[in-house]
From Swiss-Prot:
Organism: Arabidopsis thaliana (Mouse-ear cress)
Positions annotated to bind L-homocysteine: I485, G486, S487, E538, D653
Organism classification: Eukaryota, Viridiplantae, Streptophyta, Embryophyta, Tracheophyta
Binding site for Zn(2+) 1: H695, C697, E719, C781
Cofactor binding note from Swiss-Prot or TrEMBL: Binds 2 Zn(2+) ions per subunit.
Protein name: 5-methyltetrahydropteroyltriglutamate--homocysteine methyltransferase 3, chloroplastic
Cited function: Catalyzes the transfer of a methyl group from 5-methyltetrahydrofolate to homocysteine resulting in methionine formation.
Signal peptide: none
Cofactor: Zn(2+)
Length: 812
């Protein structure tokens, strides 16, 4: 593996009480004063070997934060217990970076739930329904905003740009009274300083915060969020003053919104905001970090014109065109934080290739002005490869998790400054060559099949209206049919049984019997509740992607490769390292078993190719769409086998379709074309009477509704309840949707139980724009994370609401 792979995040218990000090980031020179008419700006002079990390995973190497949060929420532990776990995690992270030699170490990137929610707390922008009026925001209000409580629903949650991380969407309006209500940033800076580590506090920038917010309920949807800029900047100024008083010498503003297609007025507002903060930034070195894509030319020009900025950070993994802009114009004396180590994947960096990029930058801005960095926060990758004891040695040698990427950054910085570790670079080159030449990566037959697929189109043989008639004749469903999305609660006993079977501690016969009994319980419950189209509850599945990946070639799985999705929710993305095939049927045995337990329709449950792709760590040696088509062909075989086995309703989840949408509009059509094509490949060969469902999560679908229609599913269920029926506005505007559709009627991510009346009101809102012949009634998402008490109550109210509205329709 070489020296690089042996670097790891220290175990919490092994940390010394008094860590060695790290020289402060700006100890070499005085802080950068703001340019004024009477003073010439003095620019920070970086030493060679400068390195920087945008951000780091907060969950812990073995999900320590997840378990601490859930224990606290369940009342099993107290505030002190939770805060102690968090403090130990922060300490281990900062020390790992310090020991690795990182110069610019971030602070305030830790969060108990979400960094956007932290910013909402910092600004005191708490919606009135949570009952907060003033003072420091505590955990009760903080977690109520994230998760809801008995009397107030949670704030909306949606995808963070095109990642699988979710943020809590701020709710803003003209009457919000902003105030400095959370001192987290300065508290954590002081905490690191007490350990002898001088950090760079990180704040989400004011533009990104506002443009990722939404108008609060009751506020006109046309309300200009940027009109609040003058109201939030005073709070930012207070925070900056607080940090300076605490001894901060650097500040990092994360402004990823700059990679979006911003208009002239938005860019002007950005420029004005930072100009307005100039006096408050005096005495600080300022870094503005962008990531996830190229910075458009006009945004780049605006960024480069800012005064009082010491350095600019760019994603040079996904933002290759930004390199051309840097070549044309980069201001003299400024630092370039070059994001050459991928923060969103798990592949070991090609150190020689990255070094060439850095040398190109050296010719443009000068060696002393280049800082080696990650492309974005390492929040989006797994924590530490050292914890993977079961991965085979060859595959493991191709990988680098967050802890290893920190070492890669410093290795590049050392090499760039003339202190190249020849042994490490040689080992890295050998591992890169091993991956390129390994026979396990390429399957010629699969490559040929994909080439054939790309040359053809795939459509069902008849229109959806004709198919729905054939399906209704077979299924005989009532108006407003009820269903659930797929999963039912995963109990501790169920998880234990799966673990024991995987470890070969119980026999296959005993395992199958246990799953069968779980199916019987779930099916009986649904029949008693009166649900129309059933699911078997997915008791045999640990994860909707991992379950399929484990049965497909070209996939590998980690033991501790967890990544935060939201709050305490973590996912363990599979690794797609090679060409993909389906050796045998994956779900037919289980779906056939479940169907025999009921006379009602039973959904066969599959995960779609785009979602498997977007929720995996994907190979980076071929275009993503080619990998997606390989998965689609495997799912196609499974769909056709399910149909042959007598399964008449098949759900192909595309929960992550939209999150793969490129951030730049110019790139979106190509993605949507191949993503829709991949979905159609999976089911274009089934009979008219076989009903194809799909499900989508956490997305703003308004701008891709025509692509959703083009998917040609018979029924689509959509996560909608936290979005104030934003989706329904599409239909208000006249978009015609002839297939079945089920916008979620209640939020499964909150423990709150909606009343029958509340759900009925939602259904009536939907019927104002959707025909009762196409409307389905269902929860937002799968029920895996809820307990049975919550599920029974919520589903009972959902079915009662559907029956209530159904009876009203029959009378009219």
């Amino acid at each position: 593996m070489g020296q690089l792979a042996l670097q790891r995040l220290q175990p919490l218990a092994s940390l010394p009480r008094r860590p060695p000090s790290l020289p402060p980031p700006s100890s070499a020179t005085p802080s950068l004063p703001c340019a004024t008419a009477s003073r010439r700006p003095r620019f920070y002079v970086a030493r060679a070997m400068s390195s920087h990390i945008v951000g780091y995973p907060r969950i812990g190497p073995k999900r320590e934060l997840k378990f601490a949060l859930e224990s606290f929420w369940d009342g099993k532990t107290n505030v002190d217990d939770l805060q102690n776990v968090a403090a130990n995690l922060r300490k281990s992270i900062w020390k790992h970076m310090a020991h690795a030699g990182i110069k610019y170490i971030p602070s305030n990137t830790f969060s108990y739930y979400d960094q956007m929610l932290d910013t909402t707390a910092m600004l005191g922008a708490v919606p009135s329904r949570y009952g907060w009026e003033s003072g420091e925001i505590g955990f009760d209000v903080y977690f109520s905003m994230a998760r809801g409580n008995a009397s107030a629903h949670a704030m909306e949650m949606t995808k963070w740009f095109d990642t699988n991380y979710h943020y809590i969407v701020p709710e803003l309006g003209p009457d919000v009274n902003f105030s400095y209500a959370s001192h987290k940033a300065v508290v954590e800076f002081k905490e690191a300083k007490a350990l002898g580590i001088d950090t760079v506090p990180v704040l989400i920038g004011p533009m990104t915060y506002l443009l990722l917010s939404k108008p609060a309920k009751g506020v006109e949807k046309s309300f200009c969020l940027l009109s609040l800029i003058d109201k939030i900047l005073p709070v930012y100024k207070e925070v900056l003053a607080d940090l300076k008083s605490a001894g901060a010498r650097w500040i990092q503003f994360d402004e990823p919104i700059l990679v979006m297609d911003l208009d002239t007025s938005q860019l002007q507002a950005f420029s004005d905001a930072y100009s307005h903060m100039e006096s408050s930034l005096a005495g600080l070195n300022v870094l503005i970090a962008t990531y996830f894509a190229d910075v458009p030319a006009e945004a780049y020009k605006t960024l480069m014109s800012l005064k009082c900025v010491t350095g600019f950070g760019f994603d040079l993994v996904r933002g290759l065109e930004t390199l051309d802009l840097i070549k044309m114009n980069f201001p003299r004396g400024k630092l370039l934080f070059a994001g050459v180590v991928d923060g969103r994947n798990i592949w070991a960096n090609d150190l020689s290739a990255s070094l060439k990029t850095l040398q190109t930058l050296e010719d443009i801005v000068g060696k002393e002005k280049v800082v080696v960095s990650t492309s974005c926060s390492l929040l989006h990758t797994a924590v530490d490869l050292v914890n993977e004891m079961k991965l085979d040695k060859e595959l493991k040698s191709w990988l680098a998790f967050a802890a290893q990427k920190v070492v890669e950054v410093n290795a590049l910085a050392k090499s760039f400054s003339g202190a190249k570790d020849e042994a490490l670079f040689s080992s890295n080159s050998m591992r890169q060559a091993s991956r390129r030449s390994s026979p396990r990566v390429t399957n010629a037959a699969v490559q040929q099949d994909v080439d054939a697929v790309k040359k053809s189109d795939h459509h069902r043989s008849t229109e959806v209206s004709v198919r729905l008639q054939a399906q209704q004749k077979k299924l005989n469903l009532p108006a407003l049919p009820t269903t659930t999305i797929g999963s039912f609660p995963q109990t501790t006993d169920l998880r234990r049984i799966r673990r024991e079977f995987k470890a070969k501690k119980i026999s296959e016969v005993d395992y199958v019997q246990t799953i069968k009994e779980e199916y019987e319980k779930v099916i009986k419950l649904q029949e008693e509740l009166g649900i129309d189209v059933l699911v078997h509850g997915e008791a045999e599945r640990n994860d909707m992607v991992e379950f399929f990946g484990e049965q497909l070639s070209g996939f590998a799985f980690t033991s501790n490769g967890w990544v935060q999705s939201y709050g305490s929710r973590c996912v363990k993305p599979p690794i797609i390292y090679g060409d993909i095939t389906r050796p045998k049927a994956m779900t037919v045995f289980w779906s056939s078993m479940a169907q025999k337990m009921t006379q009602r329709p039973m959904k066969g449950m599959l995960t779609g190719p785009v979602t498997i792709l977007n929720w995996s760590f994907v190979r980076n040696d071929q275009p993503r769409h080619e990998t997606c088509f390989q998965i689609a062909l495997a799912i196609k075989d499974e769909v056709e086998d399910l149909e042959k086995a007598g399964v008449t309703v098949i759900q192909i989840d595309e929960a992550a379709l939209r999150e793969g949408l490129p951030l730049r509009k110019s790139e979106q059509k190509f993605y949507l074309d191949w993503a829709v094509h991949a979905f159609r490949i999976t089911n274009s060969g089934v009979q008219d009477s076989t009903q194809i469902h799909t499900h989508m999560c956490y997305s703003n679908f308004n701008d891709i509704i025509h692509s959703i229609i083009d998917m040609d599913a018979d029924v689509i269920t959509i996560e909608n309840s936290r979005s104030d029926e934003k989706l329904l506005s599409v239909f208000h505007e006249g978009v015609k949707y002839g297939a079945g559709i089920g916008p979620g009627v209640y939020d499964i991510h909150s423990p709150r139980i909606p009343s029958t009346e509340e759900i009925a009101e939602r259904i009536n809102k939907m019927l104002a724009v959707l025909d009762s012949k196409v409307l389905w009634v269902n929860p937002d998402c799968g029920l895996k994370t809820r307990n049975y008490s919550e599920v029974k109550s919520a589903l009972s109210n959902m079915v009662a609401a559907a029956k209530l509205i159904r009876s009203q329709l029959n009378k009219s």
